[in-house]
Amino acid sequence: MSRVCQVTGKRPAVGNNRSHAMNATRRRFLPNLHTHRFWVESEKRFVTLRLTAKGMRIIDKKGIDAVLAEIRARGEKI
C-alpha cells in the first residue's frame, strides 16, 4: 500500500539527517497517515480512507460527501 493521502495527495518527501558535525545522510519524511472509517449517510455505508491528519481536518470542514466527490472526480475508486 502506497504512503499517499487520498484527500491531500501528500506523499513521502526526501531530505537529509544532519548530525552535530553537519554530516548529511539521506532520509525520508513520511506523511502522518492513518486508516480511518467514515460513515457516509447518503450511501448508508462505511468508507475506509487512508489519509493524513490534515486530510481529516479537511473532511471535518467540507464534509465527507464533498470530499468523496472530489476523490471520485480524480478517478480513484472508493
UniProtKB/Swiss-Prot annotation:
Keywords: Ribonucleoprotein, Ribosomal protein. GO terms for molecular function: structural constituent of ribosome. It comes from the Bacteria. Gene3D superfamilies: Ribosomal protein L28/L24 (2.30.170.40). The keyword Ribosomal protein applies. One of its GO terms (cellular component) is cytosolic large ribosomal subunit. The keyword Transmembrane does not apply. GO terms for biological process: translation. Pfam families: Ribosomal_L28. InterPro entries: Ribosomal_bL28 (IPR026569), Ribosomal_bL28/bL31-like_sf (IPR034704), Ribosomal_bL28_bact-type (IPR001383), Ribosomal_bL28_sf (IPR037147). Belongs to the bacterial ribosomal protein bL28 family. This is Large ribosomal subunit protein bL28. It comes from Histophilus somni (strain 2336).
